[in-house]
Amino acid sequence: SQYIGPAGEVLYFNSETGDRGKSNLPLPGDDVGRTNIVILASKNLGKTMAIYRAAFGLGQGFVMPTPNKLVAEAQGLEAGAMFRLGFITLRERGNAIHFDEYTDSSAPRQAAKGMLPQACAMVSFNVDNLDAVDADFVADPITEYGGMRSAVFKGPAGELVELIEADR
């Protein structure tokens, strides 16, 4: 389900109401679980997906055209406007990156100098080995989070991606 939040953000919620054994959703830790799909908007879907596939060693994923009423409304387009959507699954069950290709009618998010843009500006992922990730980090990795190394890179759409080296 899609909802507009109090700051105008688009929130997606999913729930498991069927057979848990057949579901691809991760098990929640409580009544509300954790993020399992992150959404990245980009003006060049193919390039953006290719960068993530290379950086994380991900599979091909898929791309399909689809209508999205909320995105169309936010961009001042007709409700039936078609958008290209991409989807790449991650290692853990039910986790994925969902890519939306925005049209030229969408404006870049504005940010004050030295500040993050409005809405989601950063996401974190666990990785096995920071040194194996093909990314230009904004600074050398640091040790935090109880002794785990982490580093941040700037993605192709201007997003910040924190990688945390974690044992699984």
What residue ranges belong to the model's regions?
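Amphipathic alpha-helical segments
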Residues: N44-Q60, A132-D134
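Eukaryotic modular interaction domains in large regulatory/scaffold proteins
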Residues: S105-A107
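Vicinal oxygen chelate
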Residues: S1-G33, I39-L40, Q60-L90, G94-E101, ...
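Low-complexity, glycine/alanine/valine/leucine- and proline-rich hydrophobic stretches
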Residues: A119-N126
